[in-house]
Amino acid sequence: MAATSPHLTSIPQAVRVAASIDPSIDPGLKQQAIDYLTKVKQLSEETWQLYLQGAGAPGPSTTGRDGKEKLETDMRMFCLQVVDTVLIQKPEVMGADAVQGMYEAIVEFIQVEYIGGSCEGGQGFLRNKLAFTISQLFLRAFPSHIPTFLHPFFALLSPPTSSPPNLHPQLLTIRLLLEIAQEIHDTTLKTARIMTKERQERDGVVRDVIRSSGDDKTAVQGMLGIIEKGLEQMNSGNSSDKWAEAVDATLKTLSAWIPWIDLGVALNPTTLPFYHRLLHQPILSFRTATAGIYRTLVAKGIQDPSSRLQVLRVLAPVAVIDPLETETRGGKSEEVATFRASLGVVLSAYGVALIGISDNTEVAEQLRNEAEEMMNPALPLLLRFLSDRQYEVPLSVSPFVSDLLRIYKRMYKPPNPSTKAGQAPSPPSTLPQLSPERRQFLASMLDILIRQLAWPEDTEWEAPGNEDELDEDIAAFKNFRGSCRSFIESIAQIDKSLHTEVVARIVIATLDAYASGGGAAAVPWQQAELAMHLVYTFGEVSKNSTRAAFYELPPEMATKAARNKLRAAQGSGRTTPSSSDNVDLGPSSNNDRLEYEQFPLSPLGQLLTRCMTSGISSYPHPSVTLQYFEIIVRYIEFWKAKPETLPGLFEALLDGQGIHNSDEGVRRRCFYLFSKLCKDCRNDTVEGMVSPILDSMRDMMVINAELPPTDTPDEDPLIKATTGKSYVADQLYLFEASGNLVYLTKADPAKQMALLEAVAGPLLSGLGSGVERARVDENDLQAVLQVHHHLMALGHFAKGFPIVPDKLVELLPYTGPFKQMAEALLQAIEILKRRRVVRDAARFAFSQFANAIGTPVAELVPRFVSAVVTEFEPSELVDFLLFLQLLMHRLQGSTFETMDMLLLPLLSRIFTVLQQPVTGTDEAQVHARLKDAYLAFFTSLMNENLDGIFITDRNKPEFENVLTTLFNLTQDYSDGASQRLAFGFFSRSVIAWGTSPEAAARPSVFAESAMASQSKMVSGGGTAQPNAHAVTQEQRAKQCLPGYENFIYQRLLPAAFEVPANSQFNIRGGQLIVHEAAVLVRNTVQARGQEAIDFMLSDLLRRLNCPSDIANQLIASLTTQQAKDFKKTFFDFIKAMRG
């Protein structure tokens, strides 16, 4: 053993130092002690006998009966740990004699210490540690070495006769039995162990022998005896606390044994009445534990359905639970709730068991009917548990409810119509009707579930916001509300009309009570919020978000396909009358316009109308008004059809109930809802209200840049202020809304410019003042934050304007102002380019300006890029590459010069970062994200027809290095994402740089069947070319890069076959990679024509030992199949190559 400090010459001293919490002890000395003890454990095969003696020495006190000093508690614990180590980690070093010797030593120690001694001073943790060690020895010795291992311990289960009672021997045995049960059966504990086949077999053998030897019966009888004696003594008032501990521990252990012992041992004429008696004990913890035992018996896995039904009849859970539920109903204590939940679990297990029989078509019909008859009396009891307002109680019966609704859905739910495109829906299939009894039961359940959605009276409402810091009670309620909602939706799927009836009754009663003059005094806020919540979620049942959801349309008009069919019939002169003969379908057009208002309102439409006319929007509690605003936004299509309602909706959201609410949480949520309303509700009515709306919200658009306090000296206040959820982050929604509103006034350019100036002017002023302050004092962090916030606000304002095609940009009156904003941004970034938060905000704002006005900002891109390209942190490069991709897509060819200038500096920065060693998970994530980002950036260059950038005079010297780097990535089997992106790049490159003039001049080698629908439409003049094909094949041929065909044939095309065929390639997870390789093969044939086919048939496929008939089949598929079909063919070909 390694040399140690002279201070650590003995194990006891090392244990004392290692276990000490004295801060004055030298940390180095303490670590040395820990290392020393770890080494001792590692050598347990040599030292366990010594430490077994230490563990079996007399318990801790001054002196033992033999007059010798006893070991300290920490030392005894360490001795047991060493013994545990050899039993658990090195059992092979212990032969039969060693096992027998350890067993005898432990039994002797128990006899001396627990029968005739001080029971280790009564310290429960030492007793429990000893029990664990004995359990590990049991698993090593039983049944092969010591089949009677447990017998001496069973003898200890006899109730003590002494007064006061010495229960430590019994508690030790009870704990031992618990440890054994957990090791060989407890699924939770077993998941924490390394489970080998040998261990599983061993556990099965131990359980079997315990059952066959009768040890299970002995153990259960002994445990029941302790419980019986304990109850007797407690009722007499003798040592109640000690006996309560013993009974509690024994019930826990009995619960752990019953799942795997013989049913006849756990359930017989003696035990059943005993369980009933326990369930009525005054101590709730005993009752709860017994309910757990009862649940295990109910759920016992009996294969024969007849036998299982017989056991369930004997247990009679409904008869047992019913009076207990009645007795405890209304109890508010946590213990009562826990007991009631345990009863609910019993009922749930009973229901699930019966459903498992009644729903099993392989079971005899008589038994299935019996199971259903037995279940019916449980249903009223199920509803009583569901109606409990303590969440854990109704949640305890969730499995029963889920299974019940599942079988009802299968029996009664109408199937989803399988309508193909262009076809009218098929007529609904005939389903059995719900019986009156079942419908009443579901109505009662639905009513209970809906009322459970109401906020508890003792819970204070909070506006939605930071869910991470949600109050524990509110989080529990929202979780419970979600569970109830899922059950409600299931019932709605079974019987939609029932759901409509119950919801409408509750909502209308609430709205009528409020509207009739009672107001908030007649309708508590919880009830009002519930009504709004029901309206808000009502539309989820129909899964229809179109205007048709608000009107009752005839079946033949319910879908666009059906309306087209009806128009065709009307146009053909059909004379057979139908319910839609008097319906105005409107002019036939691609827009499928329909005058919905001629139809009666659907239930949802009626509820929305009731909400609007009831005045509930003025309810004096924010939970109700906020939910009303959520309804407005969710069902905006309804309000758009009723333009007369829109002014009132906007006014409600703009006043003190909405964005001006005194509650910050409500206000912030309303910022988002108002923005959503402005975005989704663009029509003439809103256009006329833009000016007053903007005036009403102007005071809410004042930006205050406030630095937050930092938690540590190293924390950056700027980063903290600009990440996560903040008031300003929500405030930005208002600027996006203002952009939407200003754009609506496009018909009046002068008005639009005035409104734009009214919004953007203060932002530019705030930006300018912040920049000036930061220029004067670069350490003025508040000024930096002000610049960030104002840039973000300008970006969100621009985001409210739509993307306009380049050909219309010159007609936009706001092109000039947005270009001025971009120039102000450039001035800011040039001064504050060293600030990460300013760079982030500038990228966002500039990208939004590019979206809003397009190519006019292209001339500013080089200046922007030059200002920031040298300032990026490694983690920021990813965001910058994404920013460049966005610019390329929006500005396309206008960015060529910028990208040409930027490519080499970018590559230098990227590869500098990627070449740095990875020292932790953060660096690994940065590397992975950066690799994906630059590959995606390269692919975007190809997609936007900017491939010429790679071969300009400036960049051509690095072209081969780029190709080599990317090609190496196709061979990197450890990084599938990079492989896929690299193959994707090369599949585009063969078109860009490898298209031969010969292939372009000759007819295509592809059959017409290989052309996609889009390609056929393009060639036929039926549609415009998408961007990816904006360059014709003839133009590509003129740009062909001399020598690139050699790279294709020597490297790329062989790699497309060889990489996925390699044994290192993960074929199961690499399907997308193989698909990209297939595209590379197909694009090569498209670019090179017959030459590529000849190369594959005469050279490549032969080198791959591909039989000629298989090779010909592959080429035939390649030239006749569409791309998506060839991908599958190629994947199958690769799998066949791999064998």
Swiss-Prot record:
Which cellular component, as a GO term, is one annotated location?
nuclear pore
Q: Where is the signal peptide?
A: none
Tell me which Pfam families the record gives.
Exportin-T, Xpo1
In terms of InterPro entries, this protein maps to: ARM-like, ARM-type_fold, Exportin-1/Importin-b-like, Exportin-T_C, XPOT
- Tell me, what is one Gene Ontology molecular-function annotation carried by this entry? tRNA binding
Q: Where is the composition biased (Polar residues)?
A: 572-589
- Record localization: Nucleus; Cytoplasm
Q: Which GO terms describe its biological process?
A: tRNA processing; tRNA re-export from nucleus
Q: Any idea what job this protein has?
A: tRNA nucleus export receptor which facilitates tRNA translocation across the nuclear pore complex. Involved in pre-tRNA splicing, probably by affecting the interaction of pre-tRNA with splicing endonuclease.
**What is this protein identified as?**
Exportin-T
- Species name: Cryptococcus neoformans var. neoformans serotype D (strain B-3501A)
User: What gene is behind this protein?
Assistant: LOS1
